[in-house]
Amino acid sequence: MSQPPKILLLYAHPEPQDSVANRVLLQPAQQLANVTVHDLYAHYPDFFIDIHHEQQLLREHQIIVFQHPFYTYSCPALLKEWLDRVLSRGFANGIGGNALAGKYWRSVITTGEPEDAYHADGNNRYPMDDLLRPFELTAAMCRMHWMRPMIVYWARRLQPDVLSSQARAYGEWLSSPLPEEER
């Protein structure tokens, strides 16, 4: 049996102390040897990102997980800055920019609204797949494989047993994220 692939979990929450759901989701990840949890707000409170360090982390991992709350149909500001600065031309895209080609991208997102708010007749007027399209396109621009996102809807209002169940499922996926033939 082969080793599980190395996973870089980029965690971006500007107020982690207030996030019950993300704290619970991170617990299984922090126990796994194949997962590097990288808290962007803890590392870069001033938003001055060490681009070379971040690019080296990306080179060292096969799967990149972006875990964050869904803010204004996107991600928190520091993660957006990270995407714009770290996934640069010549590294992740453009001529010679193939450092991430063939790697995997998975978004793990918590929302403040129920799942039925994300459809044509819902509060947000679009399904979540449509709202996540910019992330999917960014993965494609970097020649990465887009993996089905994990969405935790109405995160603050979930019953503890439901949230624990989702965290267990997340931990199981992190333990074995790819079929054997893709490792």
From Swiss-Prot:
Its EC number is 1.6.5.2. The keyword Transferase does not apply. This is Glutathione-regulated potassium-efflux system ancillary protein KefG. InterPro entries: Flavodoxin_fold (IPR003680), Flavoprotein-like_sf (IPR029039), K_H_efflux_KefG (IPR023947), KefG/KefF (IPR046980). SUPFAM superfamilies: Flavoproteins (SSF52218). Interacts with KefB. It catalyses: a quinone + NADH + H(+) = a quinol + NAD(+); a quinone + NADPH + H(+) = a quinol + NADP(+). The keyword NAD applies. Keywords: Cell inner membrane, Cell membrane, Membrane, NAD, Oxidoreductase. It is an enzyme of class 1 (oxidoreductase). GO terms for biological process: positive regulation of potassium ion transmembrane transport; potassium ion transport. One of its GO terms (cellular component) is plasma membrane. GO terms for molecular function: electron transfer activity; FMN binding; NADH:ubiquinone reductase (non-electrogenic) activity; NADPH dehydrogenase (quinone) activity. It is a peripheral membrane protein. It comes from the Bacteria. The lineage of its organism: Bacteria, Pseudomonadati, Pseudomonadota, Gammaproteobacteria, Enterobacterales. Regulatory subunit of a potassium efflux system that confers protection against electrophiles. Required for full activity of KefB. HAMAP family: K_H_efflux_KefG. Its main location: membrane. It is found in: Cell inner membrane. Belongs to the NAD(P)H dehydrogenase (quinone) family. KefG subfamily.
